[in-house]
Amino acid sequence: VCSSDLDKQKLTIMHIDADNKRFQDFIAETEKKLDMEITVEKCPSNADNRQAKISTILASGDQNIDLISVNDEMISEFKHKGYLEPLEKNVMTEEVRDSFPQEYLESICEENGHIYSVPFQMDIMMFWVNQELLKQAGLDEIKDTGDFDILQKSLKNSDQYAYGDAWENTHVYNSLAQFVNFWGGDYFDWTDPKTQDAARYMKSMLDEKITSPAQFVDQYEQMEEKFIRGKYGCVFMYTGALGTFLDADVYGKNKIHMAPLPMFHEKKSTNIATWQYVLNNASENKDAAFRFLQYTASYEGSTEYAKIMKSYPARVDVIENEDIDLEGIDMVRKYLREYTLNARPLCENSMGAVSDMG
């Protein structure tokens, strides 16, 4: 029996992908499946404005927005504030929770025995190489730090570097955390000799001109653009950049592609991040919100999301098992199986702390 539109449950979601045609298709499919009316609203694209706007909505008890997409930085702040509905009873039950990266959930999504978000999209920090520049240096792959020197010596132009990065003050913590993990240190403990060694190694890359001093003002957009133009032999960048490289027509096994992690020091580990849904405590449509979240957190919903969006879902079992037509999925599976996955080191004042460290 078809329910009339009057009886349909309604839901309003503020979402980072509101303008994305694929996401609109996913929502249309979900509306049919759940027999629900879903309105999607845009959020600001600039990270600081976005955090400020969402913070205001939640703090003011605004009832017009039910679900909001947030990143690691936002959940790290909001989960302490009492604005969010806990989800462990209705959505993120033990069984569902087991399908997500465990250490990540504990570190990012949970607080005081409650779980406050449902991750839907996973970003994994991958090692990307420009195969043309490696080939020119006589290398098949970059296995260790010695290969950086070989690569650097083979580069023809003074504005080309073996390694590229984004060291602008709001971005550098991604790389700091990555290198500290390689050295087995602790980002929150700068008295730890391993932490110090990791930072010293990054400084030595600069001193030995393996990486560019110009990147102190670069965010990911600038780093990606230089990488696309053949200025860098390799970079660390999240899987989310895949679309950018595909659109620029530089992705491929003989061009720019994801590669196994080199052995820098003692550990092979990498950062992961997600986009996740949170439920506004002030929402008057909690039943509808729970149904939507149960679906997106489920194996079926997560698979549907990955197939329509062509991006990696947050459920590890879906990435492992499903026949998802995603470039580079075999390399992503290798990372999930063989390397330690770390949440980035974020604290309650996440945005401020990240910039201060930078």
What residue ranges belong to the model's regions?
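Conserved N-terminal structural module of periplasmic/extracytoplasmic solute-binding proteins
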Residues: 4-83, 93-97, 141, 263-266, ...
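Long, aromatic- and glycine/proline-rich binding clefts that accommodate carbohydrate-like moieties
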Residues: 5, 256-259, 307-356
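Extracytoplasmic/periplasmic substrate-recognition and gating elements
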Residues: 28, 32-33, 42, 59, ...
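Short helix-initiation/N-cap motifs at beta->coil->alpha
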Residues: 43-53, 73, 145-150, 215-228
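Paired acidic/hydrophobic, glycine-rich loop segments that form the ligand-binding mouth/hinge
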Residues: 66-69, 233-238
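Hinge/lid segment of periplasmic solute-binding proteins
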Residues: 72-126, 149, 157, 175, ...
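Periplasmic solute-binding protein
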Residues: 73-83, 102-141, 166-188, 199, ...
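Glycine-centered hinge/linker elements that transmit conformational signals in sensory
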Residues: 152-156, 188-219, 261
